[in-house]
Amino acid sequence: YITSYCFNDENCKKQLVSGRNVLFRSGDEFAILPHRIRLKLTDHNKQKLLALREFDVVEFYDHNLFDIFYQNSSNDNTLVITNQCNSNCIMCPCSSWFRKRQACETTEHLCNLVKYIPQGAPHLTITGGEPTLHKEGLFDVFDSIRENLPDTECLILTNGRTLSNVPYFESLINHLPPKTLFGIPLYGPNASIHDSITQSNGSFFQTVQGLHNLQQKGIPFELRFVETSINSMSFLETCVFIAQNFPKTTVVNIIALELTGSAYENRNKVWIPYEKAFQNSRNGIKYLIKSGINVSFYNFPLCKVDRSYWQLCSKSITDYKIRYAEDCKDCELKTICGGVFSSTLLATKMKLIPPKRI
C-alpha cells in the first residue's frame, strides 16, 4: 500500500475522498485506511513513523516492512526509476551486481507514487541507475508530474547518453515537467579519460551530443565532475572544454567520492584525498568563474577546503549517510559543515582537523 500520513481527521477525510490510502495516526497507534488494517509495529518502527509530518508518503509491504518515500521536511526526495545503468562507472557508489539485478519499476507504480506527493512540493529528484532506460514509460511518469506537480522543480539525473538519440530526445522533451533541470556527469575533456571512468566505449561522444541537444533547445542543465585519482589532474582542461562548448551550463558541481559499491571495490584506483582533490581543482574553478559559470563543491567537509572557497561548499550528503569524526566533536563550524560519508570515513580513516571560526 502507498499511503499518505495523516493525524488530522479532516485531512484524513480529504485524502480518502480523493481516492488515496491513508496511514492514520491516533495517539501512538497506526492504521491503513480505508482498509482498516491496524499495524503491529516494533517500537523502533513506531518511533520512525511518529517522527513523520502530515502528508509524508509511506509505502508498506508488510506491518514492519515499509519505505518512507517522501518527507516534507527533506530537501532530498527522490523518485528512483531503476537501478540499472548503461554505463559501468568505476567509482559508482552502487555495486555492479546491484545495478544488474534491479529491474525498472513499473510505470503504473511510479505514477501512483507521484500522485501521493503533496501538491506544492518544492523539489523532486528523478534518478536511477539511468532513468531513460525506462524508455517511453518515463514519458508517462513525466506526464504524471506535469499533471499533479506543475510547480515542483525537477532535477533529472542522467548520464545523458540516451539524449544523443534524436528521435527519443525529441519525444522526451515534449513530456518534460515545466521546471526541469538536467544533472549530467562529465568526467573529463576527452573520450580517453571519460570512457575510462564509465568503462563504456563511446559514452563521451554520446554524452557530449546529448548536452549539445539540450543546449540547442534551451533546456537548462548542470554538469557533475566526480573527482577521482584518474581524472583529477585533468580538471582544468575539462573546465576549458565546458566553457568553450557548453557556456550555458548553470553550474559545475565538483563531487567527492562516496566509497561504497564499485567505488570501494576500486578504491586503490580511484581514491584521492579530499585536500588533494581540492588543490587540483583550484585553477579550474577560477577559469569557470571567469567564464561566468557557477561552481559548487559536493561532499567536501569544510576542513578540507580553503576558507576562501567555503561559500562554494554545499551540504549535499543525505542525512542518514552523514558522519563526523571524533575530531569534529568540538568543531565550532559543525552546524554549517556537510560532514563526510560514513562509508568514506570508515574506509579511509581520514584525519579531520576542525578549523576555527573567525
Mark where each language-model region is.
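N-terminal [4Fe-4S]-dependent radical SAM core
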Residues: 27-78, 96, 308-315
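Canonical Radical SAM [4Fe-4S] cluster-binding loop centered on the CxxxCxxC motif
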Residues: 69-108
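Short Lys/Arg-enriched alpha/beta "domain-start" segment
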Residues: 1-24
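Conserved C-terminal portion of the radical SAM core fold
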Residues: 124, 179-183, 205-268, 276-302
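Distinct, well-ordered alpha-helical segments
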Residues: 136-143, 164-174, 233-241
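Flexible mid-to-C-terminal extensions adjoining Fe-S/redox cofactors in radical SAM and related proteins
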Residues: 306-358
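Short Fe-S-cluster ligation motifs
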Residues: 112-131, 352-358
